[in-house]
């Protein structure tokens, strides 16, 4: 299986490319991704994007207790709101790996993490 990638646009180059390690699918919607720089590929497959080379855009909202660590090999569960409809661009009954997901991301406010504050982007 080829390497599956999750691209998160967050400012610093080392934070902009992460690999998918797990994908949580419920009722044909992608509800959560597990990401981490050391994850090499996923065994989870979802129906997506016809030829499997397209991208999906969705807001990513909360890194929870792992904020600031997702780009440092610890990984983080990222809920996606609203959930991604995995059938919206699917054709026939074929299944494809998710290759790339792009999303704008804004760090949640977390005053306790001063080091994370320095990594926040101020918008486009």
UniProtKB/Swiss-Prot annotation:
Compositionally biased residues, Polar residues: 48-58
Top-level taxonomic group: Eukaryota
Disordered as annotated region, ranges: 44-92
Protein name: Uncharacterized protein K02D10.2
The organism of origin for this protein: Caenorhabditis elegans
